[in-house]
Amino acid sequence: MHIAFETPNQPEVISLIADLDAYQLTLYPPELVYALDLPSLMEPHVKFAVAREGGASGKIVGCCAIVLSPEYGEIKRLYVDPAGRGKGTGRGLLSLLEKAALEAGCAQMVLETGPSQPEAMGLYERHGFQRCGAFGDYPDDPMSVFMRKDLVNT
């Protein structure tokens, strides 16, 4: 598995994100899907990671972004194609984004997910995330699960 920072503005990534959007809309109403669009993913304070099978030019099977701010790095748009799951892809994406957060001086990584995604919550917990309260501009809603990982002293 090859995992590196790449532009999200490529057809395979756009297709993968469309799959993620379609999946999330089967779980949650549109007003509770807090997704970043393509222009937002291309902002300078956002790092976008891509996982490829078979090397640097292989098929894209996963992606994830981190929005860097002085307070924390927020994980967004983590998705692994069903055919690529169970191979450490999500773990690899999170590890690369954690390095970026540390390099940017972030003390924490945070994320918002939903209760209908127990597999995702399990991945985050295995990576050291713990549940926390709402952060940023998110409303405190029962259809949101907020998690954080402290990066200092880890």
Describe each model-derived feature in a short phrase.
Residues M1-K76, D81-A83, L94-L96, A100, ...:
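Acetyl-CoA-dependent GNAT
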Residues F5-N9, I14, A107-V110, G114-H127, ...:
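C-terminal "cap" of GNAT-fold acetyltransferases
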Residues D81-A83, K87, P115:
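Active-site acidic-Proline motif in GNAT/NAT acetyltransferases
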Residues K87, K99, Q108-V110:
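Charged, amphipathic alpha-helical coiled-coil/dimerization segments
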Residues G88, G105, G128:
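Short glycine-rich hinge loops at helix-strand junctions in the catalytic core
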